[in-house]
């Protein structure tokens, strides 16, 4: 088996060196048509993507599942060591949902507009939402990660055929039709953890009166028959990756750990990778909603819809000890924990000779802060381990 694995890696490298960077399905088809109907990855119950991802020292898989080869010499021992590592996230996700998955490939023909122009936004909403009488839209946001609370950078909206990325970071008010959509009770806004997006929009854009009729897909999923066959904590939110796997049979790479997630969303010109990353959530959210409705024969969602409005801070009861509002207390607790994370890293670096430091399980916000902080220290690297909801970060010291 080991020789077969080494040969497969070498053959894939030779194929890429001959053709240049190549899509996964082309490589897979070539080997199955010209070498063996059951190549080594199939024998081991892996997709070619999962197989290639076991060897990150030799291969890079791009956004469009295009595989390129790192120009470094082959080392047989390294290949076998990589092969014997714990199974990758793709295989783990398949185990979690109990079925085979297909790697999500971003559609090349998807209609996407990126703009900060008020008139373009208003026209797009009029033409693609109101004129077409859209009753459901996908909604998501992205924000620059800096270790502190930041204003939303972009808002993503998706309909069945069209998508828009609205660059709002430099806006103090929002386009008229965008406010109209948020307030419109006839349009359901679907997303994952959409309450977080709604609250942050209200926090930074006071011209938004209310955001009405939002639907968290995690709540909808819990109302279906899916949950009879899987273990779900009713108090826990289900992420997009697991929802897409259960409902669409698609595997989405760990977006929370992506370098694109950490990129500058306030740039006036977004890269193509940023555009694809950003629109994936709103686009797939709408797909998941539509598929769930087909599977459940139009499940009634009225009791799951939520409205969000501005809270008048002057009317919020103050904490008697510190004279702080609830929001201010939450902010202070967040800042306290961020400082605690940094302090633990510094203390370990200064007082401990061990090569690794393992944090307890934490949510994506705090994991991102660990990664961002570690990037500033040349001799350290960090990696997220585990599966939701028990993901944690390991920091490694490089001597």
Swiss-Prot record:
Please list the GO biological process terms of this entry.
nucleobase-containing compound metabolic process
**EC top class, in one word?**
hydrolase
Q: Name one GO molecular function term.
A: 3'-5' exonuclease activity
Q: Which key words tag this protein in UniProt?
A: Exonuclease, Hydrolase, Nuclease
Residue span, 3'-5' exonuclease domain: 118-297
Ranges for domain R3H: 335-399
Q: What is its EC number?
A: 3.1.11.-
Tell me one Pfam family matched here: DNA_pol_A_exo1
According to UniProt, the name of this protein is Putative 3'-5' exonuclease R431
Organism of derivation: Acanthamoeba polyphaga mimivirus (APMV)
């Amino acid at each position: 088996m080991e020789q077969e694995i080494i040969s497969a890696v070498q053959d894939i490298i030779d194929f890429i060196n001959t053709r240049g960077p190549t899509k996964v399905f082309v490589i897979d088809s070539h080997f199955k048509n010209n070498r063996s109907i059951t190549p080594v990855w199939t024998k081991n119950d892996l997709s070619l993507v999962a197989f290639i991802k076991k060897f990150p020292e030799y291969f890079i898989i791009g956004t469009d599942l295009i595989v390129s080869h790192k120009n470094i010499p082959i080392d047989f021992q390294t290949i076998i060591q990589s092969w014997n590592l714990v199974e990758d996230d793709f295989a783990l996700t398949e185990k979690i949902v109990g079925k085979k998955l297909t790697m999500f490939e971003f559609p090349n023909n998807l209609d996407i507009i990126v703009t900060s122009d008020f008139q373009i936004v208003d026209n797009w909403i009029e033409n693609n939402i109101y004129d077409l009488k859209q009753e459901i839209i996908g909604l998501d946001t992205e924000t620059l990660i800096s270790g502190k609370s930041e204003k939303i950078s972009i808002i993503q909206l998706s309909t069945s055929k069209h998508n828009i990325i609205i660059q709002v970071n430099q806006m103090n008010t929002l386009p008229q039709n965008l406010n109209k959509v948020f307030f419109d009770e006839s349009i359901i806004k679907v997303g994952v953890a959409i309450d977080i997006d709604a609250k942050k929009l209200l926090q930074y854009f006071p011209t938004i009166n209310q955001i009405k009729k939002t639907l968290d897909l995690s709540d909808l999923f819990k109302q279906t028959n899916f949950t009879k066959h899987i273990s779900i904590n009713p108090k826990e939110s289900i992420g997009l990756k697991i929802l897409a796997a259960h409902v669409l049979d698609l595997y989405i790479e760990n977006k929370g750990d992506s370098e694109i997630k950490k990129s500058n969303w306030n740039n006036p010109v977004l890269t193509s990778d940023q555009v694809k990353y950003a629109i994936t959530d709103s686009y797939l959210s709408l797909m998941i909603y539509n598929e769930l409705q087909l599977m459940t024969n139009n499940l009634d969602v009225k009791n799951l819809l939520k409205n969000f409005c501005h809270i008048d801070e002057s009317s919020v009861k103050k904490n008697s000890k510190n004279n702080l509002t609830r929001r201010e207390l939450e902010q202070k607790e967040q800042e306290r924990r961020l400082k605690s994370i940094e302090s633990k890293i510094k203390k370990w670096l200064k007082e401990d000779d061990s090569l690794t430091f393992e944090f307890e399980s934490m949510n994506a916000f705090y994991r991102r802060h660990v990664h961002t902080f570690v990037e500033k220290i040349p001799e350290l690297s960090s990696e997220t381990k585990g599966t939701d909801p028990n993901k944690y970060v390991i920091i490694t010291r490089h001597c």
